[in-house]
A protein has these predicted regions:
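Structural alpha/beta surface segment adjacent to cysteine/selenocysteine redox centers
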Residues: 27-117
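Extreme N-terminus of proteins, especially the signal/transit-peptide cleavage junction
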Residues: 1-10, 38
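Short active-site neighborhood of thiol/selenol oxidoreductases, capturing the structured segment around
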Residues: 7-21, 26-30, 45-48
Length: 117
């Protein structure tokens, strides 16, 4: 009698900033893809910290102004990217309320808290 093959074991280092919406989308998409493998793969996901904006001042910055300055985008391009983010998030079951988020902050302390939690 044939025994079912043991699932392949893989380690995935997922590098992410806790405030990055694209990272949240990527993690959800990864978890969904792994779920579709129906036990063929056992993935051990290790979350690795990364600061997208380590030089932000303590009070943070207006999110739209920050994105315009960082990427050289217009306000219209920032809004178009937000809409793309909403759509992609919805496609993997993750919804964003980007109208309410008005500031972006340095995440060093958040990463430190997660490390010690």
């Amino acid at each position: 009698m044939n025994q079912p093959a043991a699932p392949a074991q893989i380690r995935i280092d997922f590098v992410s900033d806790v405030s990055c919406p694209w990272c949240a989308i990527g993690l959800n998409a990864l978890q969904q893809a792994l779920g579709k493998l129906d036990g063929e793969v056992h993935a051990d996901i290790h979350l690795q910290p990364f600061e997208l904006n380590p030089r932000l001042p303590a009070g943070g910055e207006d999110a739209t102004e920050h994105l315009m300055r960082k990427y050289g985008s217009s306000a219209q391009e920032v809004e178009a990217n937000r809409e793309m983010l909403r759509e992609r998030g919805n496609s993997v079951g993750f919804s964003f309320d980007l109208e309410r988020r008005s500031r972006i902050y340095n995440t060093f302390d958040a990463h430190r808290l997660l490390h010690w939690a």
